[in-house]
């Protein structure tokens, strides 16, 4: 077994432990908690593959990190932080569109993972645009703040929002929720398009209608 593979796993285990302490002290936000959960699953899988005990690996990882920090200069740390990527907040919607109250004539609500989807089933034969405000890191959607569906007249007819009781979501969660929202709106012969910002950072690829093709699950 390659020694670098082992040491990498040990350091990752210790860093996960540190991040868990941050969450336990209620200092982490939703994206932080989401990454923590995903990395926990990854570490369990890696530990099983390598045949290594996570608790023992965490202790060794702590020793490795402590040794590195002891040798690290403050100047080197500043340079590392300066070069680290920062998340960006992108806005399709104005403050008014983001905060506007709306109601549904024929309400339908569905929970898809940690996201809540709301659709007004009374809307028919409309051209609809999906807009969203969200943060981006590494050119991918990091955290969805709110997504809303607007008619050409500016009426809100659908929405996707994070559930406060289930913090943290992945880009796949967002894609699935968008698919459900689009499928629900198209059921009533509405034409749905996705904003260029969402296409670029959340969908990666789109068809000629400006949106990602739906999977069979999303069409339901």
Curated annotation (Swiss-Prot):
Coiled-coil intervals, chain numbering: none
Compartmental location: Host nucleus; Host cytoplasm
Chain residue ranges for the region called CPSF4-binding: 180-215
Motif (Nuclear export signal): 137-146
Gene Ontology BP terms: symbiont-mediated suppression of host cytoplasmic pattern recognition receptor signaling pathway via inhibition of RIG-I activity; symbiont-mediated suppression of host gene expression; symbiont-mediated suppression of host mRNA processing; symbiont-mediated suppression of host PKR/eIFalpha signaling; symbiont-mediated suppression of host type I interferon-mediated signaling pathway
Cellular component, GO, one term: host cell cytoplasm
Record PTM text: Upon interferon induction, ISGylated via host HERC5; this results in the impairment of NS1 interaction with RNA targets due to its inability to form homodimers and to interact with host EIF2AK2/PKR.
InterPro entries (alphabetical): NS1, NS1A, NS1A_effect_dom-like_sf, uS15_NS1_RNA-bd_sf
Cited function: Inhibits post-transcriptional processing of cellular pre-mRNA, by binding and inhibiting two cellular proteins that are required for the 3'-end processing of cellular pre-mRNAs: the 30 kDa cleavage and polyadenylation specificity factor/CPSF4 and the poly(A)-binding protein 2/PABPN1. In turn, unprocessed 3' end pre-mRNAs accumulate in the host nucleus and are no longer exported to the cytoplasm. Cellular protein synthesis is thereby shut off very early after virus infection.
Subunit and partners: Homodimer. Interacts with host TRIM25 (via coiled coil); this interaction specifically inhibits TRIM25 multimerization and TRIM25-mediated RIGI CARD ubiquitination. Interacts with human EIF2AK2/PKR, CPSF4, IVNS1ABP and PABPN1.
Protein name: Non-structural protein 1
Gene encoding the protein: NS
């Amino acid at each position: 077994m390659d020694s670098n593979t082992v040491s990498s796993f040990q350091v990752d285990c210790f860093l996960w432990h540190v991040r868990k302490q941050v969450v336990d002290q209620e200092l982490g936000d939703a994206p932080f908690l989401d990454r923590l959960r995903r990395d926990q699953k990854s570490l369990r899988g890696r530990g099983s593959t390598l045949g290594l005990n996570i608790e023992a690996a965490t202790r060794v990882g702590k020793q490795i990190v402590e040794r590195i920090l002891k040798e690290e200069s403050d100047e080197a740390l500043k340079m590392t932080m300066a070069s680290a990527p920062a998340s960006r907040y992108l806005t399709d919607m104005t403050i008014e569109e983001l905060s506007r109250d709306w109601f549904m004539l024929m309400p339908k609500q569905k929970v898809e993972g940690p996201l809540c989807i709301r659709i007004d089933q009374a809307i028919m034969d409309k051209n609809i645009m999906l807009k969203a405000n969200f943060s981006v890191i590494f050119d991918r959607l990091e955290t969805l703040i709110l997504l809303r569906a607007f008619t050409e007249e500016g009426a809100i007819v659908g929405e996707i929002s994070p559930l406060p009781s289930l913090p943290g979501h992945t880009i796949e969660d967002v894609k699935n929720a968008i698919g459900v929202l689009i499928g629900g709106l198209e059921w009533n012969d509405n034409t749905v398009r996705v904003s260029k910002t969402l296409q670029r950072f959340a969908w990666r690829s789109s068809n000629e209608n400006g949106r990602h093709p739906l999977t069979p699950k999303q069409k339901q």
